[in-house]
A protein has these predicted regions:
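Generic structural signal for short, flexible, solvent-exposed coil/loop and linker residues
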Residues: 2, 7, 37-39, 60-64, ...
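Generic "edge-of-domain/loop-turn" microfeature
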Residues: 12-14, 45, 82
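Amphipathic, interaction-prone secondary-structure segments
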Residues: 34-56
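Charged interaction segments
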Residues: 49-136
């Protein structure tokens, strides 16, 4: 079973804009029906997808997010990749997204575990198992 992560970016951020913010180019992606896919398994340990979506609902314990429109930045973790390397690479991209914009964002594991959130400019790390694999 794969581990899936999502960075949910409410608003109108486009896949093209986010790709650039993540240090990737249009040529790094295959685009089909509005879904941008970059196979980064060999170098980073995951497949990255970017897609616009609407009417989202995300829930974790007592936290919920219901964006009307949002960008879904998906990370499908390669189970063969070393977890520490893969998760550090994944977090590097999340941190880059945070550093290059001011939108609210939520980083979620397997569709149900909130790992990190920025809301109203405030950044909150949730104490979950993900952090065991990355150095601060």
């Amino acid at each position: 079973m794969a581990i899936e992560y999502a960075l949910v970016v409410p608003g109108r951020t486009s896949p093209e804009e986010m790709a650039s913010r993540l240090g990737l180019e249009r040529g790094d992606f295959e685009v089909s029906k509005g879904v941008w896919t970059a196979d980064l398994r060999r170098d980073r340990g995951f497949i990255l997808t970017l897609r616009r979506a609407k009417d989202g609902y995300f829930e974790s314990d007592d936290w919920t997010l219901e964006p009307d429109k949002y960008l879904h930045v998906g990370f499908r973790a390669d189970k063969a990749a070393p977890p520490q390397v893969r998760d550090r690479n994944l977090l590097d991209l999340v941190e880059r997204a945070l550093a290059t914009g001011d939108e609210d964002m939520a980083f979620i594991e397997n569709g149900e575990v909130l790992v990190l959130e920025r809301a109203g400019g405030e950044l909150r790390r949730v104490p979950v198992g993900f952090w065991n694999n990355v150095e601060p």
